[in-house]
Amino acid sequence: MAVSQEPDTPIALSVGEGELIGTSVVKAARPEVSLIELEIKPGGSVQPHLHKGHSDSFYVLEGEVEFYVGDEVVQGSPGTYVLAPPGVVHFFKNVSDEPARALNLHTPGGFVEYRRELETLHAAGEKPDTAFFERHDIFDV
C-alpha cells in the first residue's frame, strides 16, 4: 500500500516500503502525523533545535542513539522511546560504530515536506538558510 496524504485512507507498509527521501523512508505524510524511518550513520547527529508547533518523538529500532531532550540525556537502544514536546530543545547522535535506525514521529504532521525540500537542496549542492528552517518549524539553538 502506498503512502497516502489523505486523512481517511488506511496505511499498511512493510519494512522498507514507503517514499524514499535520501536514506529515510516516509511511512506517513498526513496533516495530523508524519512518520519517517531514519537511518543514522555512525557518528551521525542533528544540531540542537526545537519546534514551536509540533511534538517530535523517536522510537529506536536498531543501534545505539544518544538523545538529548531538555535537561535529560537518554541512552537509546532498541525499544527506547523519546518525546520532545513543542518548545523543548532536543537533538540526537549515533554513538556506535554501526548504523542505527529509528522511527521519527511528528504530531501534528507536515514535516515530510521539509525532508523533501532539504533533499532537493542537497542534490543541487545548495545549503538551506535560517528562513528555510524557520518555515518548517525548526529553530536552532
What are these regions (language model features)?
Residues 26-28, 47-52, 93-95:
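Short histidine-centered beta-strand/loop micro-motifs
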Residues 83, 91, 97-113:
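A short hydrophobic beta-strand segment most commonly corresponding to one strand
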Residues 6, 71-89:
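Short acidic-glycine-tyrosine-enriched beta hairpin
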Residues 36-51:
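Conserved short histidine dyad/triad with adjacent acidic residue
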